[in-house]
Amino acid sequence: MKANELREKSVEELNTELLGLLREQFNLRMQAASGQLQQTHLVKQVRHNIARVKTLLTEKAGA
């Protein structure tokens, strides 16, 4: 997911995206804890995507 794609979205869409990413992060953490996660790099990718969305939400709130 690119920041440019996210910048085009509205605040409601970003909040929906954030909720989906948080759910995905939870599921990945549960898989990692139970030893079922094969692609551990996905945890980092999701964490960075969450940070991107939160940054854009903060920018839009200030503007």
From Swiss-Prot:
Keywords: Ribonucleoprotein, Ribosomal protein
Gene, per the UniProt record: rpmC
GO cellular component labels: cytosolic large ribosomal subunit
Organism domain of life: Bacteria
InterPro entries assigned to the protein according to its UniProt record, in alphabetical order: Ribosomal_protein_uL29, Ribosomal_uL29, Ribosomal_uL29_CS, Ribosomal_uL29_sf
Pfam family, one: Ribosomal_L29
GO molecular function, one term: structural constituent of ribosome
Coiled-coil annotated residue ranges, if any: none
GO biological process: translation
Protein name, as recorded: Large ribosomal subunit protein uL29
Entry's family note: Belongs to the universal ribosomal protein uL29 family.
Membrane-spanning parts: none
